[in-house]
């Protein structure tokens, strides 16, 4: 008792440490996640803003570029002829302020004014040019002083002729570059070396506020750049973080409390299981399997019982699920393999005698089961036929079917235990190709009743016969059930009608024909327990 109390005291101290660590990690993780997500959100908004502005301006300029190709053939025609097509094109392109035709360096026809005789160099010093240009400048003719964006398209084979389109860029930027606080303090359009700053018109250089960050996106189609200025995603995230502290503290306290509740029993019990394995507190029991026709014992199912000196007999219904949850089911299975081999002398020395051992699907992962069988079973060269009964507590999807094929190659039979009650699927029968289906005792108990399970029992039997799979009925307790199962072609029967689970050392006496003795352990009669 003293040792158990010491274990509990140590566990409680460790439990407090674990819960405190969980709470602190939750606090730090929550704040970190909120900081990172807010920073990413800030950055995403800046990027989306700039990309949206670039995309929209591209959409404006692309039709102008296509339209200028249509207007190039008008160069050289009299303005009286070209004026109407210019006006129609300007009307179609709603963002255009005016379109002009240039020949010999002179703007001679405008969509607004008609005939003109203005040197184009007076409008923009870089015109005419032999290559396409995009420039920001000031309108000196129509709306004097307002910014415009000029797109120049030269005529083929000429450096003094082309189409000049003036775009109402001020209106566009007013819609596209309006700052979005707090992420974006200011935005501007840069073409060549001039900048159109929202709310400030054309400037030759952009202001650089202290502690602000600048983000730029350039168009892949046209020579312009969108500049976005703001306090920066990281700085804003730090500024926003204190508002998340109350929620993070509450969440960390909640996680700490949940961890305290979750570890109250399960962690201590996992320690008990490890201790039980180390001190060999687990004992192997077996339940005979009888041939349905001859009534002769043809095998056993190995069962595990735990006589805990600190808490008394513990049912498999208690320790098996907890062992699975804490990843201790594989060590328990290894223990069963080792003890079965050590006591194999209690079984008939016949290759026709079956020894069934339960394994979890998780044991199939990464070839662990093959390694364990090589170490504990095959190395001893037992004569008896090994049957691995795959339990359905875990999803059978965990089974590595390559391992299943390797087991068949090694002459190990596979059985699906408690078929129809867990995670199995009929489609897996074809993939796994089991040799045996074990009908769960709940279906056996329904025999002779009107319960739905009675119909399911018939379906399982028919399925096994159709697939040529050997059938074992568990939980046979009455002669009526046994007769029904024999009549319907079930090959092997198992249940209290024939024998209760017994320690392995008592099996030879039972097999010799004596009455099944009371199950004992260390001189004490054990309670009757369920098979699982």
Swiss-Prot record:
Classification of source organism: Bacteria, Pseudomonadati, Pseudomonadota, Gammaproteobacteria, Enterobacterales
Catalytic activity: 3',3'-c-di-GMP + H2O = 5'-phosphoguanylyl(3'->5')guanosine + H(+)
Enzyme class of the recorded protein, top EC level: hydrolase
The protein's Enzyme Commission number: 3.1.4.52
Disruption outcome: Cells lacking this gene show increased aggregation, increased cellulose production but no increase in surface attachment.
Gene name as annotated: pdeD
GO molecular function: cyclic-guanylate-specific phosphodiesterase activity
Chain segments annotated as transmembrane: 16-36, 245-265
Regulation: induction: Expressed at 28 degrees Celsius in late stationary phase, constitutively expressed at low levels at 37 degrees Celsius, more highly expressed on plates than in liquid medium. Expression is RpoS- and CsgD-dependent.
Keywords linked to the UniProt accession: c-di-GMP, Cell membrane, Hydrolase, Membrane, Transmembrane, Transmembrane helix
GO biological process: DNA damage response; regulation of single-species biofilm formation
Cellular localization per UniProt: Cell membrane
Pfam family, one: EAL
Stored SMART domains: EAL
Function according to Swiss-Prot or TrEMBL: Phosphodiesterase (PDE) that catalyzes the hydrolysis of cyclic-di-GMP (c-di-GMP) to 5'-pGpG. May serve as a negative regulator of cellulose synthesis (as has been suggested for S.typhimurium); overexpression inhibits cell aggregation in strains able to produce adhesive curli fimbriae. Cyclic-di-GMP is a second messenger which controls cell surface-associated traits in bacteria.
Designated name of the protein: Probable cyclic di-GMP phosphodiesterase PdeD
Entry-linked InterPro entries: CSS-motif_dom, Cyclic-di-GMP_PDE-like, EAL_dom, EAL_sf
Example of a GO cellular component annotation carried by this entry: plasma membrane
């Amino acid at each position: 008792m003293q040792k158990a109390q010491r274990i509990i005291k140590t566990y409680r101290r460790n439990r407090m440490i674990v819960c405190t660590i969980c709470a602190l990690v939750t606090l730090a993780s929550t704040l970190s996640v909120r900081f990172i997500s807010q920073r990413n959100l800030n950055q995403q908004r800046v990027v989306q803003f700039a990309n949206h502005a670039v995309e929209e301006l591209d959409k404006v300029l692309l039709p102008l570029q296509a339209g200028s190709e249509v207007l190039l053939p008008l160069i050289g025609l009299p303005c009286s002829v070209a004026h109407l097509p210019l006006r129609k094109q300007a009307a179609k392109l709603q963002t255009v302020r005016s379109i002009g035709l240039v020949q010999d360096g002179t703007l001679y026809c405008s969509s607004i004014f008609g005939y003109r005789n203005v040197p184009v160099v007076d409008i923009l010093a870089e015109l005419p040019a032999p290559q396409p240009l995009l420039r920001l400048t000031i309108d000196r003719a129509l709306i004097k002083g307002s910014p415009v964006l000029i797109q120049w398209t030269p005529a083929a084979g000429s450096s003094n002729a082309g189409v000049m389109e003036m775009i109402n860029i001020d209106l566009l930027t007013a819609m596209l570059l309006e700052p979005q606080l707090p992420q974006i303090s200011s935005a501007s359009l840069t073409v060549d070396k001039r900048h159109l700053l929202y709310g400030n018109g054309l400037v030759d250089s952009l202001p650089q506020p202290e502690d602000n960050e600048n983000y730029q996106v350039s168009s892949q189609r046209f020579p312009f750049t969108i500049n976005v200025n703001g306090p920066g995603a990281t700085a804003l995230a730090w500024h926003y973080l204190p508002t998340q502290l109350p929620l993070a503290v509450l969440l960390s306290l909640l996680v700490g409390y949940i961890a305290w509740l979750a570890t109250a029993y399960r962690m201590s019990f996992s320690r008990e299981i490890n201790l039980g394995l180390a001190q060999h507190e687990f004992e192997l029991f077996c339940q005979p399997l009888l041939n349905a026709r001859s009534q002769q014992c043809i095998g056993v199912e190995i069962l595990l019982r735990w006589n805990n000196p600190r808490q008394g007999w513990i049912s498999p219904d208690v320790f098996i699920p907890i062992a699975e949850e804490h990843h201790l089911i594989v060590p328990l299975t290894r223990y069963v393999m080792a003890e079965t081999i050590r006591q194999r002398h209690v079984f008939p020395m016949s290759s026709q005698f079956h020894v069934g051992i339960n394994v979890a699907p998780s044991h199939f992962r990464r070839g662990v089961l093959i390694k364990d069988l090589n170490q504990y079973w095959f190395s001893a060269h037992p004569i008896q036929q090994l049957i691995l009964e795959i339990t359905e507590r875990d999803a059978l999807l965990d089974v590595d079917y390559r391992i299943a094929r390797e087991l068949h190659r090694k002459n190990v039979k596979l059985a699906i235990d408690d078929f129809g009650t867990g995670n199995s699927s009929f489609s897996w029968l074809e993939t796994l190709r089991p040799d045996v289906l074990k009908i769960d005792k709940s279906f056996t108990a329904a025999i002779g009743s009107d319960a739905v399970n009675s119909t399911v029992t018939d379906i399982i039997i028919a399925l096994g016969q159709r697939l040529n799979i050997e059938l074992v009925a568990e939980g046979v307790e009455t002669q009526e059930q046994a007769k029904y199962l024999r009549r319907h072609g079930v090959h092997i029967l198992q249940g209290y009608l024939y024998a209760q689970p017994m320690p392995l050392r008592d099996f030879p006496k039972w097999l010799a024909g004596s009455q099944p003795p009371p199950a004992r352990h260390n001189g004490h009669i054990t309670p009757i327990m369920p098979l699982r």
